[in-house]
From Swiss-Prot:
This is Probable manganese-dependent inorganic pyrophosphatase. Mn(2+) 2 binds at D15, D77, H99, D151. Mn(2+) 1 binds at H9, D13, D77. Gene3D superfamilies: DHHA2 domain, inorganic pyrophosphatase (n-terminal core). It is found in: Cytoplasm. Belongs to the PPase class C family. The gene is ppaC. It comes from Streptococcus equi subsp. zooepidemicus (strain MGCS10565). It is an enzyme of class 3 (hydrolase).
Length: 311
């Protein structure tokens, strides 16, 4: 077997980078695998904050597994092929560690697969360290903590599992940080949107979902001021229309999430706005609507869209 590439999803967030980096370390230590952690995109500002804080270099970015000489891959923080590497159907998936729905995915051979309904893939990787009696280095503990904080908005998201609270406390101790203090600093680092172009903003954290024959792009940006983001609405809509035309998305749903008050504004464009309105039981006005208490794409947006689209 050639070298195994380990990576998270496209447009990697902190959990994608953290879980893949940590699993790469674990794979070498516990399973004696010849792995290399890579990424399917550059780290965002939140992730860059975590990497810098714990003195870790960002994984190198790749676009094709076969171009790297890899015939086998390990996926973390995703399993759906549209969210993975460009040639995912041309290589063998050796393993998966994820905490999302399982969809748009199949393999020719059996594989290692660990999927749990917890707050982050990082939570699962930490559990694997403990199960295999591998000590967690300080930098890796810090990254795993960062992945958990990011995906659960500092344990406030409804995706937070009861076990995640204990995991966060243990990882914070191993990383030598104060959970609340470090967590808020990291999250705020990811809300600096002023320097982003509209095209960059809608691609910071975006995933494509195949819903009943429709390619639906669901993106999320975190902020401390929704109104400030909506001041750029016209330019954001222009960027959305451009990417829909170039990539063939039927619909685009952007979550603008207030990390302080735990609410979101939904900005949506596309061919199936009736289904979007049905999904969230609201009426879009000028292409947007307020969604109280919504902070999780995984739990509060994608399942509702999936049901409404009849996928």
């Amino acid at each position: 077997m050639s070298k195994l590439l380990v990576f998270g999803h496209q447009n990697p967030d902190t959990d994608a980078i953290a879980s893949s980096y940590a699993f790469d370390y674990l794979a070498k230590k516990a399973f004696d695998l010849d792995t290399e952690v890579v990424a399917l995109g550059d780290p965002n500002e939140e992730t860059a904050f975590a990497l810098d804080y714990f003195g870790v270099s960002a994984p190198r970015v790749v676009t094709s597994a076969k171009a790297e000489g890899a015939s086998h891959v390990i996926l973390t923080d995703h399993n759906e092929f549209p969210q993975s590497i460009s040639d995912i159907r041309e290589v063998e998936v050796y393993g998966i560690v994820d905490h999302h729905r399982v969809a748009n995915f199949e393999t020719a051979n059996p594989l290692y697969m660990r999927v749990e309904p917890v707050g982050s893939a990082s939570s699962i990787v930490y559990r694997l360290f403990k199960e295999n009696r591998v000590d967690v280095p300080k930098d890796i503990a810090g990254l795993l903590l960062s992945g958990l904080i990011s995906d659960t908005l500092l344990l406030k998201s409804p995706t937070t599992h009861a076990s995640d609270h204990r995991v966060a406390v243990e990882l914070a101790e191993l990383a030598g940080v104060k959970l609340e203090e470090y967590g808020m600093a990291m999250l705020k680092a990811g809300t600096n949107l002023a320097s982003k172009s509209e095209a960059e903003l809608i691609d910071i954290d975006a995933k494509t979902f195949e819903l009943n024959g429709n390619a639906v792009r669901v993106a999320q940006v975190n902020t401390v001021d929704i109104a400030e983001v909506l001041e750029r609405k016209e330019a954001i809509e222009a960027a959305i229309k451009e990417v829909m035309a170039s990539e063939g998305y039927s619909d685009f749903v952007l979550m603008i999430t207030d990390i302080v008050n735990s609410n979101s504004e939904i900005l949506a464009l596309g061919a199936n706005m009736d289904k979007v309105e049905t999904a969230f039981d609201f009426k879009l006005e000028d292409n947007h609507a307020f969604l109280a208490g919504a902070v999780s794409r995984k739990k509060q947006v994608v399942p509702q869209l999936t049901e409404s689209f009849g996928a």
